[in-house]
A protein has these predicted regions:
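Generic detection of long, well-ordered alpha-helical segments
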Residues: 3, 87-94, 127-131
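Glycine-rich phosphate-binding "P-loop"
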Residues: 1-7
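Generic, low-specificity signal for short hydrophobic/alpha-helical stretches with a mild N-terminal bias
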Residues: 6, 19, 79, 86, ...
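C-terminal domain-boundary segment and adjacent tail
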Residues: 45, 98-170
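Active-site-adjacent pocket scaffolds in enzyme catalytic domains
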Residues: 11-15, 19-111, 166-168
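Glycine-rich phosphate-binding loop at the start of an alpha helix
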Residues: 3, 31, 116
Length: 170
């Protein structure tokens, strides 16, 4: 049943956008989700994990069928506007993103690669005051050198090109 739902989602997204999706995120995975994503093929990555800060090759990857994982986040995520201990205002969201960025930027300047993933949903962050906090954050980030703001598909393409799968890396 999960495979059928996945195939239907791919069909619908392809029909609506004119392109097949290149990444996958379920959000509520089952024991077979990643295997089904690999078997379905055609994906550059999936984001159904919260276990790391950087992309990595799935442990089931093979040279013939490498599978990239780009972790998602619940930490720097606008879903926290819906939680009791989450964000109460756009200022909370901005400050949290800024603090996360500042720590990662400093670590990156010391030579450690970093990635800040921000979970955004139009029904949450698309509210005027919340959107203003995102605009402020983007302006803040643009004031720093050597920062790349990218979509997940761009990160996946970069990772495939720059850090290709090898059995030794896995």
């Amino acid at each position: 049943e999960e495979r059928e739902h996945m195939q239907e989602a791919i069909r619908i997204l392809s029909e609506i956008t004119g392109e097949r999706p290149l990444g996958w995120y379920t959000g509520r995975t089952g024991p077979n989700t990643r295997r089904l994503v690999r078997e379905e093929g055609g994906f550059l990555y999936d984001s159904d994990t919260y276990d790391d800060d950087l992309p990595y090759w799935d442990s089931e990857s093979t040279p013939e069928k490498p599978h990239l994982v780009i972790p998602y986040t619940l930490d720097t995520n606008d879903m926290r506007f819906t939680q009791v201990q989450g964000f109460n205002s756009g200022d909370d969201f901005f400050t949290y993103l800024k603090d996360a960025f500042d720590v990662l930027y400093a670590e990156g300047c010391e030579g450690a690669p970093k990635m800040l993933s921000i979970g955004m949903h139009c029904r949450l962050l698309g509210r005027p005051a919340r959107l203003a906090s995102l605009a402020r954050f983007i302006e803040y980030v643009k004031g720093h050198e050597k920062v790349w703001c990218a979509r997940r598909v761009d990160i996946a393409r970069h990772w495939h090109a720059t850090h290709p799968f090898t059995a030794e890396r896995n």
